[in-house]
C-alpha cells in the first residue's frame, strides 16, 4: 500500500522509517 503511505508522507515522510508507527499515528492516523 505505497499510495496510502504517500499521503501521510506529507507530514513525516522518511521519519516513519525511523520512528515507525508512532510518527504515522501522530500525524496522518489521528
Swiss-Prot record:
It comes from the Eukaryota. Disulfide bonds join 11-27. The keyword Secreted applies. The keyword NADP does not apply. Residues 1-3 form a propeptide. Pfam families: ANP (PF00212). One of its GO terms (cellular component) is extracellular region. InterPro entries: Natr_peptide, Natr_peptide_CS. It is found in: Secreted. GO terms for molecular function: hormone activity. Keywords: Disulfide bond, Hormone, Secreted, Vasoactive. GO terms for biological process: blood vessel diameter maintenance; cGMP biosynthetic process; receptor guanylyl cyclase signaling pathway. Its main location: secreted. Cleaved upon secretion to produce the functional hormone. The record marks 3-4 as: Cleavage. Belongs to the natriuretic peptide family. Hormone playing a key role in cardiovascular homeostasis through regulation of natriuresis, diuresis, and vasodilation. Has a cGMP-stimulating activity. This is Natriuretic peptides A. It comes from Pelophylax ridibundus. The lineage of its organism: Eukaryota, Metazoa, Chordata, Craniata, Vertebrata.
